[in-house]
Amino acid sequence: MNPTVSIAVILTVLQAAHCQMIRDLSACLLGQSLRVDCRYENKTSNPLTYEFSLTRQQKHIIQSTISVSENVYRNRANVTMHKNLVCLYLHSFTTSDEGVYMCELKATNDYTGNQIKNITVIKDKLEKCVRLSLLIQNTSWLLLLLLSLPLLQAVDFVSL
């Protein structure tokens, strides 16, 4: 095999070998609901599968596309997916829902295995969610607004 072709194949495999990585896992209270944000870096367009679970004495699957969710959480939990963010919402959150929450992500055809991150959730120690946090994930609109303020002021469109 040609050495140039070999190097190209190795680089392709190495690039595809690590397709996503969980960057951050955070939790906050949104009214009476728990929100768990699982932020990840995705380097592929392959579909993403996820699993959110809670461990107290044993593991309880809350919401998943990897395995079957437990019945007790089906009516209380939902997941939303945004660019580089998977959010779990657990409604009617109480102290009995405290424990270690896990986010597990896997991109289809990613041979490095699942990416997993844990966070300990205690209701009294949770901060309230900032409602704009999802909008800030995509900051291009915010940057455009900030950059256009001087122009808007120059034409006396906005007076600050």
UniProtKB/Swiss-Prot annotation:
Its main location: membrane. Residues 1-19 form the signal peptide. Residues 20-120 form the Ig-like V-type domain. GO terms for biological process: angiogenesis; cell-cell adhesion; cytoskeleton organization; focal adhesion assembly; integrin-mediated signaling pathway; negative regulation of axonogenesis; negative regulation of cell migration; negative regulation of protein kinase activity. It is found in: Cell membrane. Residues 130-160 form a propeptide. GO terms for molecular function: GPI anchor binding; GTPase activator activity; integrin binding. Glycans are attached at N42, N78, N118, N138. Disulfide bonds join C28-C129, C38-C103. May play a role in cell-cell or cell-ligand interactions during synaptogenesis and other events in the brain. The keyword Cell membrane applies. This is Thy-1 membrane glycoprotein. GO terms for cellular component: dendrite; external side of plasma membrane; growth cone; membrane raft; plasma membrane. The N-terminus is blocked. It is a lipid-anchor; GPI-anchor. Keywords: Cell membrane, Disulfide bond, Glycoprotein, GPI-anchor, Immunoglobulin domain, Lipoprotein, Membrane, Pyrrolidone carboxylic acid, Signal. Forebrain, cerebellum and tectum. The modification Pyrrolidone carboxylic acid is found at Q20. InterPro entries: Ig-like_dom_sf (IPR036179), Ig-like_fold (IPR013783), Ig_V-set (IPR013106), THY1 (IPR033292). It comes from the Eukaryota. A lipid is attached at C129 (GPI-anchor amidated cysteine).
